[in-house]
From Swiss-Prot:
Record-linked PANTHER family: LIM AND CYSTEINE-RICH DOMAINS PROTEIN 1, LIM DOMAIN-CONTAINING PROTEIN
Biological processes per GO annotation: negative regulation of transcription by RNA polymerase II; positive regulation of calcineurin-NFAT signaling cascade; regulation of cardiac muscle hypertrophy
Subcellular location: Cytoplasm; Nucleus
Modified residue annotations for Phosphoserine: 16
All residue ranges annotated as the PET domain in the record: 99-206
Tissue: Expressed in the heart (at protein level). Expressed in many tissues with highest abundance in skeletal muscle.
Domain observations: The LIM zinc-binding domains and the Cys-rich region mediate interaction with GATA6.
Alphabetized CDD domains for the sequence: LIM1_Testin_like (cd09340), PET_testin (cd09829)
Location of region: Disordered: 200-235
Complex and partners: Interacts with GATA1 and GATA4. Interacts with beta-dystroglycan. Interacts with GATA6.
Protein name as it appears in the record: LIM and cysteine-rich domains protein 1
Keywords of this entry: Cytoplasm, LIM domain, Metal-binding, Nucleus, Phosphoprotein, Repeat, Repressor, Transcription, Transcription regulation, Zinc
Amino acid sequence: MAKVAKDLNPGVKKMSLGQLQSARGVACLGCKGTCSGFEPHSWRKICKSCKCSQEDHCLTSDLEDDRKIGRLLMDSKYSTLTARVKGGDGIRIYKRNRMIMTNPIATGKDPTFDTITYEWAPPGVTQKLGLQYMELIPKEKQPVTGTEGAFYRRRQLMHQLPIYDQDPSRCRGLLENELKLMEEFVKQYKSEALGVGEVALPGQGGLPKEEGKQQEKPEGAETTAATTNGSLSDPSKEVEYVCELCKGAAPPDSPVVYSDRAGYNKQWHPTCFVCAKCSEPLVDLIYFWKDGAPWCGRHYCESLRPRCSGCDEIIFAEDYQRVEDLAWHRKHFVCEGCEQLLSGRAYIVTKGQLLCPTCSKSKRS
């Protein structure tokens, strides 16, 4: 008989449950005031009150997000973007780059300042290049503190990079063999697919940086540039750089995004560095390389293994329920209305929602 794996980290599990309890009552951003407040479901990643996802309630904090990304990047070639937590037993935290812009405002005798804080900015670049990058991002998606863009980033961190896609202790009821499969799965994608985009001017991707800052070309200086096919070109001739996605021109004085998994002969406009599956911007430039394109973590994992439509976790069990292109753990194949188990019973799947005939009829009426 299969055994359920022991808690990998009871402290972490208790903390996660406690966080959900303390998040009770958090308003839903999707319902726009109609939700009475977050009410955690016992195993679904939704609010029992409004049925919206946890993402729509933005339940995480900066510290939780930084710990999650730190865990994702540790034991990978991007671990330099993390820092060890003092007394944290090997835990690493994401060294998230924030950018603060202070602009003077002329209002009478006493000078005042307008301060803008970006919750995230591309690492390893000068403030000038970082600001250029941000100005190319739609205003509603710029991660400025206290704005819609900052909430958008937090939702995307939860959606594109679910903690339960990388941390077995955040999954419910993994059997011992499933635990081993998941650990190998995570180890493999960190080695073969995980990447972090690099922001640079066209032709400067992959160049050495001094003290973590992207070097700017001195005025009047000539350098040997690489063409889009990677060969060296005559510096006296203007090099044309093309975006890998839209095939549009990339101006030489405008930042682009590079992927070391793709090779530095390819570049993307900042708004074109998106998931190949959902076309959403890749949050914090974190991507997973597959089939010659960047993917978000969620859709990369789903492309290799089924995801349970009930609990939203990746399925590592050999035996599970599948209906068309949807999948469920056997124990989660239950009606979304009355929660009765539907294995061996009549059911209806409409727009991805699994219902028993009674609840389906009630919903239609």
